Swiss-Prot record:
InterPro entries: Cytomega_IE1/IE2, Herpes_IE2_3. Its main location: host cell. This is Viral transcription factor IE2. GO terms for molecular function: DNA binding; metal ion binding. It comes from Human cytomegalovirus (strain Towne).
Length: 579
């Protein structure tokens, strides 16, 4: 059983024995390996000592060189191994792990050559065996082509090293200045080449398809090294395939005409001055060569896109991030009648009057309606302000009818900073109340005043007396060719669903009128029976009217207190009578 379990001898691989317990047969290669290790053991010990007292010193006579061993091969007991020194010795060197690149004379045989080139894997030194002997190769020191060692009596040095891995290929260091961008990394803005290494394009919209900035095939100029601005790495994809928003104007000018009363060209007087003739600059946007696909213009997408550029080498002023204006949602200033008339190419006449500071007379009122972006500015409200008692009395009369759907509160105030702060605080409190419809502050636009002649007034009165058909057929349209003007005071309306909410809103608004008697005005206005701003308030309005005729389901706390006092008084009277 044991003999069948043992491994058999492999004739192709004699180094492998039949079993780990059975000694392996000696082959010429193993004999040569044992001989080399025995010969080098003393050399290794002598190399380790190096004068160290811990290691015993070996006499030089006991050491033999390889040349001397070959000369005394007849006296050596291993002469049968040296006779076959050719191929066997080369294989023994490989098995012993000897590196031929070590110091000392190189072992060169007649029938073998050792190669120490690095391989892909860390394997021992490969041996290339050749059948033809190398010319001029000899193992004796006299015929060796290399230089003789200084001490021939000393044995040659053989250092056993592990295989050396292949050295990495060292590439030359490339400077950052030597890296040039591709030719299509260039943007032209106002006839200037912008270096894209200092630009970051950020977009959060998917509607910017077709908005591209044309790129030129020129090499981008590198920014100056002394500017102190960091370089930003350009994106990997070319800029010609990216969508860009319009570049902002370096002067920060708006894209469209601004007719807001809070514009920069404002005055502190109640009427106009000579400087009002100048129009506010409505400068156009940046001039960028663009290619349009599908939509026209840069303002086609309703999104916010930012273009943040670093300082350029030309020294141009940089602007901060700016929102791109939407085309679908326009600002309130663009909804003014004056701007709409300009868009429709309506011609405006310029009155032949002199503009000056001061109050406007009735016969010179036409100079107020010249073509300008200025608003009519007022420190105080230009009309008669009713008293608080009149406003409150009219509100109470409306509340007695139990329906206030045809009533509303109008607040008019100037744009003084202190007044605006107080009004905003009241608006914040109104927003927390129930059953209210609040408007945002808005402006009023005014047209040219005209006094109608008596015949026009007579025709209108007759049409009203005749009835609805005559009034419908009346055609009295009196026009003008002057530019409408807007006043700078703000307006706001409040619509309440029930009398409870109307009186509650008045309690918040009337203190403003009391604090600013010339800058804030509160009115009660009437409308037709059109209903509420939204139908959701109809249930609350009907419940208020019905609730006045229903009996309360619970006894008020005042009645309970009165009843308890009466019971206590009756009990006290009974006690007094019993005594």
């Amino acid at each position: 059983m044991e003999s069948s379990a043992k491994r058999k001898m492999d004739p192709d691989n004699p180094d492998e024995g039949p079993s780990s317990k059975v000694p392996r047969p000696e082959t010429p290669v193993t004999k040569a390996t044992t001989f080399l290790q025995t010969m080098l053991r003393k050399e290794v010990n002598s190399q380790l000592s190096l004068g160290d007292p811990l290691f015993p010193e070996l006499a030089e006579e006991s050491l033999k060189t390889f040349e001397r061993v070959t000369e005394d091969c007849n006296e050596n007991p291993e002469k049968d191994v040296l006779a076959e020194l050719g191929d066997i010795l080369a294989q023994a060197v490989n098995h012993a792990g000897i590196d031929s690149s070590s110091t000392g004379p190189t072992l060169t045989t007649h029938s073998c050559s050792v190669s120490s080139a690095p391989l892909n894997k860390p394997t021992p030194t490969s041996v290339a065996v050749t059948n033809t002997p190398l010319p001029g190769a000899s193992a004796t020191p006299e015929l060796s082509p290399r230089k003789k060692p200084r001490k021939t009596t000393r044995p040659f040095k053989v250092i056993i090293k592990p295989p050396v891995p292949p050295a990495p290929i060292m590439l030359p260091l490339i400077k950052q200045e030597d890296i040039k961008p591709e030719p299509d990394f260039t943007i032209q803005y106002r006839n200037k080449i912008i270096d894209t290494a200092g630009c970051i394009v950020i977009s959060d919209s998917e509607e910017e398809q077709g908005e591209e900035v044309e790129t030129r095939g020129a090499t981008a100029s590198s920014p100056s090294t002394g500017s102190g601005t960091p370089r930003v790495t350009s994106p990997t994809h070319p800029l010609s395939q990216m969508n860009h928003p319009p570049l902002p104007d370096p002067l920060g000018r708006p894209d469209e005409d601004s007719s807001s009363s809070s514009s920069s060209c404002s005055s502190a007087s109640d009427s106009e001055s000579e400087s009002e003739e100048m129009k506010c600059s409505s400068g156009g946007g940046a001039s960028v060569t663009s290619s349009h696909h599908g939509r026209g213009g840069f303002g086609g997408a309703a999104s916010s896109s930012l273009l943040s550029c670093g300082h350029q080498s030309s020294g141009g002023a940089s602007t901060g991030p700016r929102k791109k204006k939407s085309k679908r949602i326009s600002e309130l200033d663009n909804e003014k009648v004056r701007n709409i008339m300009k868009d429709k190419n309506t011609p405006f006449c310029t009155p032949n009057v002199q503009t000056r500071r001061g109050r406007v007379k009735i016969d010179e009122v036409s100079r107020m309606f010249r073509n300008t972006n200025r608003s009519l500015e007022y420190k105080n409200l230009p009309f008669t302000i009713p008293s608080m008692h009149q406003v409150l009395d009219e509100a109470i009369k409306a509340c007695k009818t139990m329906q206030v759907n045809n009533k509303g509160i109008q607040i008019i105030y100037t744009r003084n900073h202190e007044v605006k702060s107080e009004v905003d605080a009241v608006r914040c409190r109104l927003g927390t109340m129930c059953n209210l419809a609040l408007s945002t502050p808005f402006l009023m636009e005014h047209t040219m005043p005209v006094t109608h002649p008596p015949e026009v007034a007579q025709r209108t009165a007759d049409a009203c007396n005749e009835g609805v058909k005559a009034a419908w057929s009346l055609k009295e349209l009196h026009t003008h060719q002057l530019c409408p003007r807007s006043s700078d005071y703000r307006n706001m309306i409040i619509h309440a669903a029930t009398p409870v909410d109307l009186l509650g809103a008045l309690n918040l608004c009337l203190p403003l009128m009391q604090k600013f008697p010339k800058q804030v005005m509160v009115r009660i206005f009437s409308t037709n029976q059109g209903g509420f701003m939204l139908p959701i308030y109809e249930t609350a309005a009907k419940a208020y009217a019905v609730g006045q005729f229903e009996q309360p389901t619970e006894t008020p706390p005042e009645d309970l207190d009165t009843l308890s006092l009466a019971i206590e008084a009756a009990i006290q009277d009974l006690r007094n009578k019993s005594q």
